[in-house]
Regions:
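Conserved N-terminal beta1-alpha1 strand-loop-helix module at the mouth
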Residues: 1-79, 83-87, 107, 155, ...
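Hydrophobic, well-structured mid-protein blocks that either form specific transmembrane helices
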Residues: 80-125
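Glycine-rich phosphate-binding active-site loops on the catalytic face of alpha/beta enzymes
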Residues: 95-101, 135-143, 175-198
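Glycine/Thr-rich beta-alpha phosphate-binding loop at enzyme active sites
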Residues: 44-45, 85-87, 108, 118, ...
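Catalytic cores of alpha/beta
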Residues: 77-87, 120-128, 164-180
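Glycine-rich beta-to-alpha transition loops that act as phosphate-gripper elements at the mouths
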Residues: 20-23, 72-78, 94-98, 114-119, ...
């Protein structure tokens, strides 16, 4: 049940912020700024030095707020997946499908969201127990691909990541996205130390996601 509790919370966020950074403290501040703006799905990437330490700090900090779901991104192998899970990650994201990562996530009852790009990769992921896939990079795949995949995989839960912005967010949902992943368009101001701007952008994205969800009820 734990896996589906975390998965449900993740999907309910509507939008997952992809957090990167050159150093630990900047990445943590970016995460805090995004959450302050109402984006409560957080993919904390393991390209950040000592990401497991930051992940532990963040998951403990926000543990009492169940609407906030913090997971690990750019997880390339099973060792890193286990490290992230033990640090408190509530979901695992990778740029491509890795069967060993899928096994670890299944063992710990943690949702695994691999990046996929072809029907073959999608089928392999589904057969390994994956419930939500990431279409990456979304900017290359495009809206028509999301729509086309819904033909052979009508129940597929999809999170496009890469190329998602405030201006095209509604189009992604209309094409069949279950939720979206937002990266540089959301957090780019953090690179210049402008965390207030990150919060302001997150507020706009949160409002847009809520409007889209409301219109589909």
């Amino acid at each position: 049940m734990q896996k589906y509790t975390f998965l449900s919370r993740l999907i309910n966020t509507g939008c997952v912020a992809v957090i990167r950074g050159e150093n630990l403290q900047a990445a943590i501040r970016t995460c805090d700024a995004v959450i302050a703006g109402g984006i409560t799905g957080i993919e904390f990437t393991f390209t950040i030095p000592h990401a497991d330490k930051a992940l532990k700090e963040l998951t403990e900090k926000y543990d009492s707020q169940k609407s906030i779901v913090i997971g690990a991104g750019t997880v390339l192998d099973a060792v890193t997946a286990r490290l992230a899970i033990l640090a408190g990650a509530k979901f695992i994201v990778s740029p491509s499908f890795n069967p060993d990562v899928a096994k670890i996530c299944n063992l710990y009852a943690i949702p695994y969201t691999p990046g996929v790009f072809t029907p073959t990769e999608i089928q392999q992921a589904l057969e390994a127990g994956v419930d939500l896939v990431k279409i990456f990079p979304g900017s290359v795949a495009g809206l028509p691909m999301i729509q086309a995949l819904k033909g052979p995989f009508p129940t597929l839960a999809i999170m496009p990541t890469g190329g998602v912005s405030l201006d095209n967010m509604e189009a992604w949902f209309s094409a069949g996205a279950t939720l979206v992943g937002a990266g540089s368009n959301l957090v780019e101001a953090a690179a210049h130390g402008n965390f207030d701007q990150v919060t302001a952008t997150a507020l706009k994205d949160r409002k847009k996601v809520d409007q889209i969800k409301q219109s589909r009820r």
